[in-house]
């Protein structure tokens, strides 16, 4: 009888813990069970004594704090690493959003689907259909990247005249004031034509003078600069990175010393600036330079603080001593990027963004704005590239034939095409959901790191798969190659705005664990509270909550793993239910493994970068699954799109599973590893990779026009015009599919099996035999010309490939000969 009541109590407490009931609820359940058990003769005085010994110290606040929490708090403070001011600023920057639900182990899927689907306004759609289409049609990407190594002057002027650099600037200052989602759509379309074009447009609309001025500038600064930035009269750049400070941007050696100097005929207090920056986009052509530097006040002209910290100022580039103009050459994607230097350049304090009172606030300003900008520009450029090369690879695979069949029917090619299709769907879902969060007022610092890392990595993977599909067509650079520049430039997005190797290993989980965990940040903050009683009370409340949270996740994880999450709640009972359930299971596993990792590694967890990376992978792939499911729901749960959803969810959940397994395998204790394997994977690993059959569906989807394929092509420049290779190829795909029945008709009537080339000769054969009409023969011959345009590559006169000094020398020799 006693054993039955004990087991019953364990079950009841487990149910309460699973549903995250309060301590008082658990206490009430325990007391009720003891009372009933006592009347039933199952419990006696000893049982009550044991219960009181445990319950009283935990329930009475004074006793608990003095004898339990106080020693734990003292030990916690000893092992907890101190946070620098820059780390605190980074952690405090931005807001938490859906990723916090995933991190806590109990995602509310109804809440996810209640977030509104982002939509364009009439004005934003008109801009995309008008100026964006126009500028795409103006640009010859080969001319820009190979011959000019810059945008043509007419394109630059068109961008300025149509306020492409003012998408983030408010209308009151002459800007467009577009939503984050609209900015993303614009950048996707520009990228689909030219990575050079989207890079130049993206940077001024991300972290830079315009964004910083709107949030922190004085009214005088806003009124002066923002209208000029909006009209294109000023070209901005922002200089942060130095030779000695790349990923560790807070360690910049550039400095400004507060001193007195002459300014416009008067002696004023100002700053003497010295800097050496590199990798600064738009620096060679900028008219105003946003500068990050460490501000020092050795003579105390502003107060008692000597080292004021990182500060941001606006410097006109026409000031004497400001060095700009020289260029870097980033992987044959020649957007304007270069170094800038200055030595002992005196400016007044009013040049600080926000005025003198914002001295030392630069790092906070930067990380707060980066949490938004990083969610838009690079992810959007990546998505635009992924979707474009997915469509182009699909059309090319259907047009190009080897061994008498389209190469897209070969299983090896299908494997690459399937990944391209899946990435195109899920990456677009992720950027739409994330920019939608920004438009809801969020500053999702963790989300922005997640999609920056994963979408740029997917872009890099996509270029590799596309290059494999295209073979020599992708290798030979020239006006007819739409892959080469993107392939060359893929590492650029990987590296900038937080190198991906740093983002994955340190930022995603390092920031996410503290920001998204419901109790860790409070526990850490308690260490810095000077009032001991207040600190103890704050820590006590957080720790007790943390313990309950961990127990709940332990119970949830065991139950969901043991049952295969079959009883987990889902918002829909259709074919997507499995993905919601598995995601809930892995969410609970993430929450539990986070607490276990913190307990095992303590303060050294921040240095266990590979452990941190795997925890970050878990969080990231759960976010990508969430975005995929939300997109499917937002677009009306169209059955014809389900194959894309299925592939994306299976792929991302498989990566979750692998990260979890690798995490377990790298725990330091063998007994712990064994216990975790038994707890998290009691019947083995449940998720399998997408099947060959499913990947065949996705590969075929990219090769045949359909409504699903059209949805994948959203905000891709597909206009059929001479300078748009991908748009022309899309038309060729339709034409090839249209004439295949004519080709088959000739083969059938002539009783021969011909290869699908020299279609002009096939057309003449059919015409001569009376099989085809003149119109049908003409159509077949026209398709042959278009087909050859698709598969042929460029060749050059050697002189056309000369560059730099060699080109200048050749030109001089020709001039001398003349």
Task: Show which residues each predicted segment covers.
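Charged, glycine-rich active-site and insertion segments that engage polyanionic ligands
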Residues: 442-474, 643-656
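C-terminal amphipathic alpha-helical interaction region
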Residues: 545-818
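Conserved phosphate/anionic-ligand binding catalytic regions in large, soluble enzymes, centered on
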Residues: 173-175, 382, 386, 465-478, ...
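Loop-to-helix element that buttresses phosphate recognition and phosphoryl-transfer chemistry
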Residues: 412-439, 467, 620-631
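Amphipathic, small/basic residue-rich leader segments at the start of a protein or domain
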Residues: 5-15, 26-36, 47-204, 211, ...
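A glycine-rich, basic-preceded beta-loop-alpha segment at the flavin cofactor/substrate interface
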Residues: 339-374, 391-408, 554-575, 586-606
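Flexible, small-/acidic-enriched active-site or ligand-binding loops
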Residues: 320-346
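A short core secondary-structure module
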Residues: 266-322
